[in-house]
Amino acid sequence: MTPAAHGCKRVAWCPSRPPASAPSAPQEAARRGDAMGLKPSCLKGFKMCVSSSNNNHDEAPVLNDKHLSVPNIIITPPTPTGMGLSRDSNKQVWMDELGSYQDDGELEPEA
């Protein structure tokens, strides 16, 4: 581990329900949760490790209470195994066992 990684803390296990004691404001927030299923009380003291642009690829700085501007990125899943994408939407292209692509109608030429 790098020295910067030693400064990172893991998010502690958090029960899905607050204790039976009278709920406080943080407990109410923890009970509601958010769309991601994370409870705010679980994130208390959480540190995030990210890479920086200082060209040091061995260490990641530890950031506390900082807002990161992250662009919206759409990641598309890979195509199903053995199927390639053709330029002609009416015709599918399949990948053979050797990893090369063939059109549906074209078989290997006979010798």
Swiss-Prot record:
Keywords: Phosphoprotein. Residues 12-34 are annotated as: Disordered. The modification Phosphothreonine is found at T79, T81. Pfam families: DUF4597. InterPro entries: DUF4597. Residues 71-76 are annotated as: Required for interaction with PPP3CA. The keyword Phosphoprotein applies. It comes from the Eukaryota. Interacts (via PxIxIT motif, when phosphorylated on Thr-79) with PPP3CA. This is Uncharacterized protein C16orf74 homolog. The lineage of its organism: Eukaryota, Metazoa, Chordata, Craniata, Vertebrata.
